[in-house]
């Protein structure tokens, strides 16, 4: 099962659309890189494998086998994790601003079910993260200048 996250970068955060077979599953947000550490990029574009991990009473989805070999274990969360300060991708019902939105537990659960079903059937689940620079300010290669 292949998922695609099409991103648009903004100074206040990243907005995106999560697709499967060109059909929209949900919208997603990511907090800006500066939210975590200066000069550290947000989750790098590339193709990631997805896995389910148990977490207390529920399961979580996380990205692993990251293209550059660092930052493995990035979670897809129900909401932005401000307590643990983790980088994460958050499914939302509505985008309300740059990297902001209304968290959607329903969208997150649907995604969890979809990934879980694929993995149980022995499929490999992947997430390709990409962007279209013409749609928004793309900070992938210019982030250091933006942060100065």
Language-model segments: which ranges?
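Cell wall/extracellular polymer interaction/catalysis modules
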Residues: 1-126, 130-148
């Amino acid at each position: 099962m292949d998922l695609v996250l099409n991103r648009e970068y903004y100074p206040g955060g990243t907005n995106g659309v999560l697709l499967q077979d060109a059909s929209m599953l949900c919208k997603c947000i990511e907090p800006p890189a500066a939210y975590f550490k200066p000069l550290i990029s947000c989750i790098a574009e590339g193709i990631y494998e997805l896995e389910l991990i148990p977490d207390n009473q529920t399961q979580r989805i996380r990205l692993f086998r990251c293209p550059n070999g660092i930052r493995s274990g990035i979670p897809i969360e129900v909401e932005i994790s401000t307590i643990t300060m983790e980088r994460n991708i958050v499914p939302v019902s509505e985008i309300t601003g740059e990297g902001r939105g209304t968290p959607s537990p329903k969208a997150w659960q649907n995604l969890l079910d979809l990934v879980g079903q694929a993995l149980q059937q022995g499929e490999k689940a992947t997430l390709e993260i990409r962007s279209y620079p013409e749609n928004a300010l793309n900070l992938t290669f210019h982030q250091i200048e933006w942060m100065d």
